[in-house]
Amino acid sequence: VKGDVVTLISENSPRWLIADQGLMRLGAINAVRGINSPSVELEYIIEHSNSVGLIVQSKEVWLKLNKKNELKKRFKFIINLEDEQFEDLINWPEFIKAGEENLLKNNSFEKYNHQINDIASILYTSGTTGKPKGVPLTHANFLHQIINLAHIADPEPGTSVLSVLPIWHSYERSAEYFFFSCGCTQFY
């Protein structure tokens, strides 16, 4: 739903990018972080961002977060980016199947009329000087980066690029969006 926040905790992968872009297409805001962050930091991000949904890289990330077995009730949904079925998390094949069924039923995907200044994502600092700070980024922020990266690089469609920085880092994300918009092949 437009404006809902979904926390996305994962490392670099094609499924991260698919989840990220799917959330943006729906008008949702994603709060992103990597799996190696301390659980207290991840819990803070979930709480601070008022997340209504959660997407995790694996069951191990979910177990790390849900030590007290209290998180499940706060979310409308929890998606596991892996194929493995675990508890009542929605695994990747189930998520894809639900999307396909919805498309067949409605003959279209739900669309969101994006506004340039709508918040697209909340990036959190590492919290080295205290609690992590949430930095809201708009679609305009990302577009500015994509446009300006074109002054630095001019790849041909099909060019192979390697993702090395954490995908939830602002520069890596901007670079991925830029290379994606150029038709490059992304490797993780």
List each language-model region with its residue ranges.
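Short hydrophobic alpha-helices that are characteristic scaffold elements of the AMP-binding
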Residues: 20-26, 48, 169, 180-181
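Conserved AMP-binding/adenylate-forming
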Residues: 1-40, 164
